[in-house]
């Protein structure tokens, strides 16, 4: 009992401690809980904790019921012990009465034997008298014999006396028969009482055995309750660890998103710095050309018209430079033709898409219409954040923040505006130095997703600024390359460096996306582990229930077997006084064992 009380107090204190811990953890993870409830409505951790608390409460109730049953069984056992003591006293009294009746029966049997012997002697005397009478009748013929009356008178007197004694003996026999019948009835009643006492003693033995079995079952239940408490504490600790890891992973995901945003900001800054660098390089080249021209003019001012001759080295350099520019212009013409064709095709595609979008916008104006996501939304970097089994598709906005899926009207309007800007500035891009590659890249961007259209518009603006600068540069040069407005003075080394930086930035972005995907996979694995843990806990609970049901079935089968054995043993307990004298010793032994168990 003391152990049971200590176990209950320990379980109650463990429950209070877990409740305090949950109360301490709950304010810190309030946003996460709200996010979980928004995502999939319920928290599996809370559901599991509530289920375990309900199981602990059920076990506590079962323990209280078992203690109440133990108290009731103890009271009933005390009453049965008192009844057994009373029955043993009555049994001893009946044994004494039986011994007295047996002694009386023996004395009466001796008297009956004596009366039977006397009866036999009287019958023999009667037969002898009859023989003498026959002799007398046979001897009447003789004259010498005395008279018959003289002979018969004493014989008749003896006969009367013998008849009187016989009558007395018959009366005594009748009285003895009555006494024997009364004694037999008393013996039957005593046997019935003895049988009832033995049956009650057997019932008391059965109840004592059942009480011992119940005590053992209560101990087993207490041990199981302790084991369940330990398992409950372990599961609570595991759930807390898993929740902590989930929070850490969420923080890591948020940090990864912030890092991705920072990387995008750095990419933009690098692009802006590269543009500024291009502009500065072009201004420097322009300044060098003007300085060379000024130097040539200053050198030729003091000479005559016939002596104004350019040095051969400078002439060769300018000729080489002009030939290179002519070759570049030819290449640019070929690239411009290709880009014009591709842009014409893109223009047709975008016109078709604009028509489709306009038709969609002219449709039902209500917000309940199904969002039409065009085919341009392809393999964009939309990640799936799976937390607790919920899939949330998110798009990366141009400022790098994670945003939810916008409504259909906003997506259509953004697509239409971005595509109109692209079509508006399609011809301007063909005048740039790397216009073909940029147009192709822009086509890839438009194929990869609608969230990259802002970048394409930024590229168009960059091309426009470069075209304006090129026009100004050609006016200052005054060379034959003024006919085409697509010249570019950016050196090839700088362009290669910029291309390498762009490739490295793309690799960094790819690595960041890969790390984010790995983190998403880790979150999915953790969610799967939580699901497997919940399934394992359910399987363990089912196993425990099955084991309890099997134990109950075994106990019921054992009870039935013991009842059958007791029923089979009961007829063998009534063989004689020897067995009855041995019965109290058998009853005293289990009672002593029960008292030892109770102590």
UniProtKB/Swiss-Prot annotation:
Keywords: Coiled coil, Cytoplasm, Cytoskeleton, Microtubule. Residues 404-420 have a biased composition (Low complexity). It comes from the Eukaryota. InterPro entries: MAP70. GO terms for cellular component: cytoplasm; microtubule. GO terms for molecular function: microtubule binding. The keyword Coiled coil applies. It is found in: Cytoplasm, Cytoskeleton. Pfam families: MAP70. GO terms for biological process: cytoskeleton organization. Residues 43-349, 533-570 form a coiled coil. Its main location: cytoplasm. Residues 227-460 are annotated as: Required for targeting to microtubules. Residues 1-30, 357-453, 557-599 are annotated as: Disordered. Residues 557-568 have a biased composition (Basic and acidic residues). Belongs to the MAP70 family. Plant-specific protein that interact with microtubules. This is Microtubule-associated protein 70-2. It comes from Oryza sativa subsp. japonica.
């Amino acid at each position: 009992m003391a152990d049971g009380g200590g176990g209950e107090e320990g379980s109650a204190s463990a429950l209070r401690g877990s409740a305090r811990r949950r109360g301490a953890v709950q304010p810190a993870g309030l946003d996460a809980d709200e996010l979980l409830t928004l995502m999939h409505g319920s928290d599996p951790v809370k559901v599991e904790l509530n289920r375990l608390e309900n199981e602990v409460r059920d076990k506590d109730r079962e323990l209280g019921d078992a203690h109440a049953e133990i108290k009731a069984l103890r009271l009933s056992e005390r009453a049965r012990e008192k009844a057994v003591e009373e029955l043993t006293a009555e049994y001893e009294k009946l044994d004494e009465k039986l011994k007295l009746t047996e002694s009386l029966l023996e004395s009466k049997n001796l008297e009956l034997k004596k009366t039977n012997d006397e009866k036999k002697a009287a019958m023999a005397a009667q037969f002898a008298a009859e023989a003498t009478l026959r002799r007398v009748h046979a001897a009447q013929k003789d004259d010498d014999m005395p008279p018959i009356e003289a002979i018969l008178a004493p014989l008749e007197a003896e006969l009367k006396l013998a008849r009187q004694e016989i009558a007395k003996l018959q009366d005594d026999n009748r009285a003895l028969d009555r006494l024997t019948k009364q004694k037999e009835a008393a013996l039957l009643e005593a046997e019935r009482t003895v049988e009832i006492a033995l049956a009650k003693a057997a019932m008391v033995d059965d109840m004592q055995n059942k009480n011992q079995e119940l005590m053992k079952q209560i101990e087993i239940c207490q041990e199981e309750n302790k084991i369940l408490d330990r398992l409950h504490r372990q599961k609570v600790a595991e759930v807390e660890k898993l929740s902590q890891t989930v929070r850490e992973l969420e923080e890591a995901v948020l940090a990864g998103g912030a890092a991705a945003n920072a990387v995008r900001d750095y990419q933009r800054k690098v692009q802006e710095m590269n543009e500024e660098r291009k502009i500065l390089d072009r201004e420097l080249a322009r300044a060098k050309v003007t300085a060379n021209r000024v130097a040539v003019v200053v050198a030729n001012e003091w000479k005559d018209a016939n002596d104004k001759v350019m040095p051969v080295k400078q002439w060769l350099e300018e000729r080489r430079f002009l030939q290179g520019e002519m070759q570049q212009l030819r290449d640019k013409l070929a690239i411009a033709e290709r880009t014009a064709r591709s842009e014409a095709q893109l223009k047709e595609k975008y016109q078709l898409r604009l028509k489709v979008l306009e038709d969609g916008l002219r449709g039902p104006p209500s917000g309940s219409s199904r969002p039409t996501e065009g085919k341009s939304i392809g393999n964009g970097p939309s990640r799936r954040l799976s937390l607790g089994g919920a899939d949330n598709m998110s798009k990366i906005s141009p400022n790098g923040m994670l945003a939810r899926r916008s409504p259909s009207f906003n997506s259509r309007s953004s697509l239409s505006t971005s595509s109109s800007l692209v079509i508006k500035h399609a011809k301007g891009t063909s005048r740039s130095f790397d216009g073909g590659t940029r147009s192709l890249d822009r086509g890839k961007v438009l194929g990869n997703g609608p969230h990259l259209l802002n970048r394409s518009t930024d590229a168009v603006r960059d091309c426009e600024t470069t075209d304006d600068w090129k026009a100004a540069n050609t006016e200052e040069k005054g060379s034959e390359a003024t006919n085409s407005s697509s010249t570019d003075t950016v050196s090839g080394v700088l362009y290669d460096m910029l291309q390498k930086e762009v490739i490295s930035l793309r690799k960094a972005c790819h690595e960041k996306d890969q790390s984010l995907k790995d983190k998403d996979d880790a979150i999915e694995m953790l969610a799967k582990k939580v699901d497997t843990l919940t399934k394992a806990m359910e399987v363990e609970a089912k196993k425990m229930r099955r084991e309890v049901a099997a134990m109950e079935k075994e106990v019921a089968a054992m009870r039935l077997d013991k009842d059958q054995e007791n029923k089979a043993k009961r007829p063998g307990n009534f063989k004689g006084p020897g067995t009855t004298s041995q019965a109290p010793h058998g009853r005293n032994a289990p009672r002593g064992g029960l008292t030892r168990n109770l102590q």
